[in-house]
Amino acid sequence: MKNSEDMVKRSVNRRSFLRNGVLAGGAAVAGAGLLSSGKTMLAQENDDARGSLDRGDVAILRFVAAAEIIESDLWQQYAELGGITSDSSTNPYQAAFQVLDSDGLQYITSNTNDEISHATFLNAYLESKGEEPVNLDEFRTLQGSQATGAQNIGRLTNLMHLTVDTSWYIRYRSTTNPDFGATYPQALTITNRTSIPITDADFDNQMHIQAIANTAAFHFGTVEQAGSSLYASLGQKVTHAEVLEITLGIGADEVAHFLEWWILPATPSPDRRSRITD
């Protein structure tokens, strides 16, 4: 995680709750019932915030720490090539993001730093409770981009052969609700596409590099909506008040990230902004 640290320096099922609770007599009544069963969501009143953690809470923290490390890995790849750089020059990939949003480069860098801080904090918290931190370094074996700006290091994630779930784009613009059985098609099909330039040759064609950035724009939303759902789900299963605070806090940050990205692929624009193939 050294490279990541350097960048910093720079169950209550929601669907069953809605179906059963709301239909049984309204959200207020169902909410009261939910709170009365408090142990799955809140710690006991006499729970010592400094005490040891329940095994289930440790498992949840280790799971989300692993997820944040993986998320940090993919965002770091985006930041190296498409985020804020130390010099004033802009490569064609960065320029393609600026076509979508003039602040796109800052968003990418900020999102990256946030994800790295999440992973760092979760591991530090685990250690403070006498638990083993999560380390995935042995799995950093994938080849990343060889374009100028990318670090020559092993990766956990491969952004050069992506299949992206784009159904969220329809879901979050729909008047229907998945909690009541609604399903959503793909907004468009993204299969085996790269979302980062693979070599400097990808910089040479404007339409081509714009298609790569457009693919990334959909991937950003896919990643962050998943993170938002993850913390909302797992937060309902913890028993320690302090762990609940952590899941709520980081989960809220994931929601904020999604709010940055959900609109990006919808930018009203010429055709070159909406293409994912060139």
Segments predicted by a language model, with ranges:
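All-alpha RGS (Regulator of G-protein Signaling) helical domain and cognate RGS-like helical scaffolds
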Residues: K2-V8, R19-G26, T40-D278
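Twin-arginine (Tat) signal peptide motif
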Residues: R10-R15
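Cell-wall glycan-active module
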Residues: L35
